Amino acid sequence: MSESLHLTRNGPILEITLDRPKANAIDAKTSFAMGEAFLNFRDDPELRVAIITGGGEKFFSAGWDLKAAAEGEAPDADFGPGGFAGLTEIFDLDKPVIAAVNGYAFGGGFELALAADFIVCAENASFALPEAKLGIVPDSGGVLRLPKLLPPAIVNEMVMTGRRMSAEEALRWGVVNRVVSQSELMESARELAQQLVNSAPLAIAALKEIYRATSEMPVEEGYRYIRSGVLKHYPSVLHSEDALEGPQAFAEKRAPVWKGR
């Protein structure tokens, strides 16, 4: 594993810390390491939730390492499994990822956060896609994911001028889930992670699968699709031991014990 990436396992929760002073920028080597970490998380049956954060209190990530770019790393370089930052192109990850944004999330750093399922950010966090000012475009998900969250006028301003969005504005628009103080950031992310662990893993996997498959469909078409039998996790949930355990635990006034089957 890269020395720029620190992994910590807390039971079923994996914490990934990007630590590349001064701005936690990501070059191809670091991106490969991040992809390996996320794929291992995906494939490890003991892990349920991942938290990605940045080292320090100023930068979550400034995105692509422009020093590496100046030294010849191309914008379309091979950034490894999972695409840039290891997460932006993993489309079969059925476990939740929380981005704990501790500071500036610019360019690919913002795209990394957008690829997560939840964003918890510190009050000093801000978000921007300044690629157009550098002669490139935010093609690691920024131009694809941001329009699903914001009105076109706001998206156009952000991607064409590089305008920054504060943590509070991001909360108002629903881009982030929570805004907390810097000192409370990881505590808040871990609290959310534990809430996710308390939910049934198969149900979480089915929800992510359904979201991916039906997000662009009309509601009626979505109903037909999820009942067509083509999905992997949804039918499994209906006939799982966990589907029996949930109501049984509720009736017995105890916490459910999920088996993931």
Curated annotation (Swiss-Prot):
Q: What InterPro entries does this protein map onto?
A: Carnitinyl_CoA_dehydratase, ClpP/crotonase-like_dom_sf, Enoyl-CoA_hyd/isom_CS, Enoyl-CoA_hydra/iso, Enoyl-CoA_hydra_C
UniProt-listed Enzyme Commission number(s): 4.2.1.149
Known catalysed reaction(s)?
Answer: (R)-carnitinyl-CoA = crotonobetainyl-CoA + H2O
A single BP term in Gene Ontology: fatty acid beta-oxidation
Q: Which domain of life is it from?
A: Bacteria
Top enzyme class, one word, equals: lyase
Q: Which PANTHER family match?
A: ENOYL-COA HYDRATASE, MITOCHONDRIAL, ENOYL-COA HYDRATASE-RELATED
Supply the name of the protein.
Carnitinyl-CoA dehydratase
